[in-house]
């Protein structure tokens, strides 16, 4: 089956709506569903589904895992936007979760999604073997936890107004931050997609390298867009990282050098695809869209 970005987005949106039904106590499920179903690019579930398809698996088998990863992503956004974290009022052009439901419910909705997501994997992955499901859950807990996106969030908080002059030390911190805060969910998406397709270890390592590189490129692009875009284009408050003295690619390297680094990262992604003979119009489309939006 040939799928494009819009096909994937429609599929994921329909399933996300199906997987989270409003039940008692309604406020928690409404809060969970609010952020999960906000309009978005759905890159992480798309990359899970497309990796599975690209490596010979069935898209249908990967849908629960792909949607679980989007729920995990939504959880990170809810908590990231909280006043005690980044204190953002808007996400994707809409009020952030705590602005709609209050801080207490937002915290609990994030916690709920963190545990709700793996339940989706175990409940709806009937076509996968128990061993495959255990492998997928292990990947989920690894990238979701204290050695994954949480580690990235901690370093992000601690990077505010860093009193470090050494450029190499700053680069090391910046890379660690973005590998864990951003790349880890892309790695989770592609690694689980490969596992569902029953790919061998070499293919899993190849998609891991692609995902890690793409995640860094995505974060550089995000930093660039924060500098050159408007609220209407991004749907969120701009310039907050700079105001708060956070470490970003643009604050460390400047706009033009950041664009050069982005171009190199995207070229490396294409090299990995070519070397492995991976064929994917969707991945090419994603890379080209980033180039277009950032003007490189």
What are these model-predicted stretches?
Residues 1-296:
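All-alpha prenyltransferase/terpene-synthase fold signal
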């Amino acid at each position: 089956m040939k799928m494009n970005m819009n096909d994937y987005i429609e599929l994921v949106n329909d399933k996300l709506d199906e997987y989270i039904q409003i039940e008692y106590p309604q406020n928690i499920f409404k809060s969970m569903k609010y952020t999960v179903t906000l309009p978005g690019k759905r890159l992480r579930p798309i990359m899970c589904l497309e990796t599975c398809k690209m490596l010979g698996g069935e898209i249908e088998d990967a849908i629960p895992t792909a949607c679980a990863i989007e729920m995990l992503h939504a959880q990170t956004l809810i908590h990231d936007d909280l006043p005690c974290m980044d204190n953002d009022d808007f996400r994707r052009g809409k009020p952030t979760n705590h602005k709609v439901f209050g801080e207490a419910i937002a915290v609990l909705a994030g916690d709920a999604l963190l545990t709700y997501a793996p339940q989706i994997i175990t409940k709806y992955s009937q076509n996968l073997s128990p061993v495959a499901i255990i492998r997928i859950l292990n990947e989920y807990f690894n990238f979701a936890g204290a050695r994954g996106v949480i580690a990235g969030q901690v370093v992000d908080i601690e990077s505010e107004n860093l009193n470090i002059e050494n450029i190499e030390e700053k680069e090391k911190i910046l890379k660690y931050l973005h590998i864990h805060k951003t790349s880890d969910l892309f790695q989770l998406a592609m690694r689980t997609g490969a596992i569902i397709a029953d790919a061998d270890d070499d293919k899993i390592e190849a998609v891991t390298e692609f995902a890690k590189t793409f995640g860094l490129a995505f974060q550089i692009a995000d930093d660039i867009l924060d500098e050159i875009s408007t609220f209407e284009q991004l749907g969120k408050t701009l310039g907050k990282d700079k105001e708060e003295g956070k470490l970003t690619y643009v604050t460390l390297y400047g706009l033009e050098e950041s664009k050069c680094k982005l171009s190199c990262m995207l070229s490396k992604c294409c090299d990995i695809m070519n070397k492995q003979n991976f064929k994917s119009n969707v991945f090419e489309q994603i890379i080209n869209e980033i180039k277009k939006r950032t003007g490189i």
